């Protein structure tokens, strides 16, 4: 049985496709499969990909490349990720022939108890507020990955990104569009305009954006290691900002932060084994969707058919209903992972799909009946090490609160 691991269903290309790669008269763009002998990087921005390729050319591992790419994306694509967010990764190590999983998500401040959170009609925590903050796990994730699989010093990984952030880079169309759409929500949040609205507005397509404060933060990380972020000057600056705006962070919260190496979970799909991280990340939903889809002749539908896309949407509705009901931090809750991944359970859920109409609402299933938000990147090196990494602010610019002194 062949094995793959993924954090999303994706197509990755390491180079721009030539015009001849795009067939005429098709409703979607296609690209030729790209082959490489010494490594490959896939990410959402070409400059980030270039940073990763430079690391591989310098003898770095796939993990080294992934760290550098993620750092670059935090500057180039702040509408999706950054040092203020969390990180999740899987690494295939060819030396041990083992798949490793890393959960580098942060926890809520210890002093933030539920009685301090304002009541909302829908029972959720206000996203664009200090009540949604968790300790940023990204930096610790970098150093955990580097300590286990890195080859080059961190200064060689973060230094070029710091230079890029200081000099600036043109903003691409899609990122500029997302940036502009976010302004109405974030323009009055503390620190946001100072860092992300140069000249009082979002940068337009093609305009150069720079973040010198982030550049300095990356240089301090490269020189001082993870402790400068969790026990040193960077933590002090973030906590001071938190105090100013009514947040709940403390130095002890930062000092207590740790990432966790976890065992990935998997399902099979038509002869392939697909891997994800267990909750609190939400990759389990992708595995549930695959289990549901396996009961349908997807190939016969054709990729452009209404049946194909209808099925994808309905399967996602079913998986997301379970996500809302069952997924949680497994340190504090029992998540029925095995039951949710049961093929029998998927078959029962699949029966709820009506190929003639869309479901207006979907209830979560009962997987126990028989038993009582983000950017993505991949990197591979010449030795066969593979990295799948997701890093996120949860949604767009996160809460919208920005610490000007550190640029995140």
Where are these regions (language model features)?
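Short glycine-rich loop/turn motifs
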Residues: 37-39, 86-88, 262-264, 286, ...
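Hydrophobic h-region of N-terminal signal peptides that target proteins for export
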Residues: 10-18
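A short acidic/small-residue loop/turn micro-motif
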Residues: 107, 394-396
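A short, polar/charged loop-to-alpha-helix boundary motif
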Residues: 112, 396-408
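Noncatalytic scaffold domains of N-terminal-nucleophile
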Residues: 20-50, 62-224, 229-231, 236-281, ...
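Bacterial N-terminal signal peptides that target proteins for export
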Residues: 1-8
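Internal maturation/activation junctions in enzymes
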Residues: 295-393, 403-406
């Amino acid at each position: 049985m062949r094995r793959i691991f993924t954090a999303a269903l994706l197509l990755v290309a390491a180079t721009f496709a030539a015009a001849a790669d795009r067939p005429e008269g098709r409703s979607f763009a296609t690209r030729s499969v790209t082959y490489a002998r010494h490594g490959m990087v896939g990410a959402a921005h070409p400059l980030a990909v270039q940073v990763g390729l430079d690391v591989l050319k310098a003898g770095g591992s796939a993990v080294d490349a992934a760290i550098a790419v993620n750092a670059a994306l935090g500057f180039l694509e702040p509408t999706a990720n950054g040092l203020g967010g969390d990180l999740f990764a899987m690494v295939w190590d060819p030396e041990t022939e083992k798949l490793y999983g890393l959960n580098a998500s942060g926890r809520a401040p210890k002093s933030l108890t539920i009685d301090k959170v304002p009541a909302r009609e829908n029972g959720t925590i206000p996203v664009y507020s200090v009540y949604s903050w968790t300790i940023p796990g990204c930096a610790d994730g970098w150093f955990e990955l580097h300590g286990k699989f890195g080859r080059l010093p961190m200064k060689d990984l973060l230094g070029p990104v710091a230079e890029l952030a200081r000099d600036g880079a043109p903003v691409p169309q899609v990122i500029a569009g997302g940036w502009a759409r976010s302004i109405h929500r974030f323009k009055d949040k503390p620190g946001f305009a100072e860092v992300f609205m140069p000249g009082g507005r979002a940068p337009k397509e093609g305009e150069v954006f720079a973040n010198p404060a982030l550049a300095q933060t990356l240089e301090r990380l490269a020189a001082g290691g993870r402790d400068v972020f969790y026990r040193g000057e960077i933590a002090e600056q973030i906590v001071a900002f938190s105090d100013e705006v009514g947040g709940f962070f403390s130095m002890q919260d930062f000092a207590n932060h740790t990432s966790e190496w976890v065992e990935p979970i998997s399902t099979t799909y038509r002869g392939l084994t697909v891997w994800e991280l267990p909750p609190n990340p939400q990759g389990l939903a992708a595995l549930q969707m695959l289990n549901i889809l396996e009961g349908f002749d997807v190939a016969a539908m054709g990729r452009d058919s209404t049946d194909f896309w209808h099925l994808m949407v309905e399967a996602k509705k079913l998986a997301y209903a379970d996500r809302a009901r069952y997924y949680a931090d497994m340190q504090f809750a029992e998540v029925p992972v095995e039951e949710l991944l049961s093929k029998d359970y998927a078959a029962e859920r699949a029966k709820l799909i009506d190929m003639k109409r869309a479901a207006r609402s979907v209830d979560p299933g009962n997987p126990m009946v028989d038993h009582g938000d983000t950017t993505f990147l991949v990197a591979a090196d010449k030795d066969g090490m593979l990295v799948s990494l997701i890093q996120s602010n949860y949604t767009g610019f996160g809460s919208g609160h920005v610490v000007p002194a550190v640029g995140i």
